[in-house]
């Protein structure tokens, strides 16, 4: 199966999961990225079951609205039973690197509110040690150079994210992203805490302190489920 076929397979499995596990009338948490987009498309078939959805990005909000979902502001919501999102890498403990799509801060906020985080990914995303995928760090623009020096001191090689057109990439929050290569992440929780303490960092794309509760992994043998 191709990677796109695996993504579609796991997106449908996630839709089946929320149909079974999320009570009618509840609010659904929705992530960002190519696999999350396929999940939105799949879950739209029974969108009337939900009171609405909380989205982690402007892009996902638009896709949800195109399908007729009511998109709610997180400030209006007391409880999210399940948040479904992809990952750029995930390890055996359920810790993840996220943020390849640029929505890491809002993803982390929505995930922190959710009772369960369901990670959906194709088999290539499951790794023994994270760090091959450059670690995204969202940064206040004025602190870009100062934060880059701190990340270099931690052993990383930060690079400012650019758009395809050659401009500086800006997040939905108006900030910039440093993508940090060269890190072998042996202690995800410790590194998440260390980077988050650097002045000027909004958040780091390590989801270890609040990792996945469930992994739905698309493989050539079908969808494998892991509970953490």
From Swiss-Prot:
Active site (record annotation): 107 (proton acceptor)
UniProt keyword list: Isomerase
Residues bound to substrate: 32-35, 85-88, 98-101, 125
Top-rank EC class of the record's enzyme: isomerase
Subunit text: Homodimer.
Role summary: Catalyzes the reversible conversion of ribose-5-phosphate to ribulose 5-phosphate.
Pathway connected to this protein: Carbohydrate degradation; pentose phosphate pathway; D-ribose 5-phosphate from D-ribulose 5-phosphate (non-oxidative stage): step 1/1
One GO MF term attached to the UniProt entry: ribose-5-phosphate isomerase activity
Name this protein carries in UniProt: Ribose-5-phosphate isomerase A
GO cellular component: cytosol
Family: Belongs to the ribose 5-phosphate isomerase family.
UniProt key word Isomerase: yes
EC annotation from Swiss-Prot or TrEMBL: 5.3.1.6
Alphabetical list of SUPFAM superfamilies matching this protein: D-ribose-5-phosphate isomerase (RpiA), lid domain (SSF75445), NagB/RpiA/CoA transferase-like (SSF100950)
Keyword match Nucleotide-binding: no
């Amino acid at each position: 199966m191709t990677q796109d076929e695996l993504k579609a397979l796991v997106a449908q499995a996630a839709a089946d999961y929320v149909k079974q596990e999320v009570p009618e009338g509840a609010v659904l948490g929705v992530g960002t990225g190519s696999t999350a987009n396929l999940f939105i498309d799949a879950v739209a078939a029974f969108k009337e079951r939900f009171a609405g959805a909380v989205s982690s990005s402007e892009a996902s909000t638009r896709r949800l609205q195109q399908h007729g979902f009511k998109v709610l502001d997180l400030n209006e919501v007391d409880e999210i039973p399940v948040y479904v999102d992809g990952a750029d890498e995930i390890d055996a403990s359920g810790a993840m690197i996220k943020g390849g799509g640029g929505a890491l801060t809002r993803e982390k906020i929505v995930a922190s509110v959710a009772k369960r985080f369901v990670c959906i990914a194709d088999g290539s995303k499951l790794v023994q040690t994270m760090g091959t995928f450059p670690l995204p760090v969202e940064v206040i623009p004025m602190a870009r150079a100062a934060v880059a020096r701190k990340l270099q001191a931690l052993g990383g090689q930060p690079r400012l994210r650019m758009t395809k057109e050659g401009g500086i990439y800006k997040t939905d929050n108006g900030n910039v992203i440093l993508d940090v290569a060269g890190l072998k992440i042996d202690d995800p929780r410790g590194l998440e805490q260390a980077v988050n303490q650097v002045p000027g960092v909004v958040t780091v794309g390590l989801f270890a302190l609040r990792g996945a509760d469930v992994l739905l992994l698309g493989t050539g043998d079908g969808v494998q489920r892991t509970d953490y």
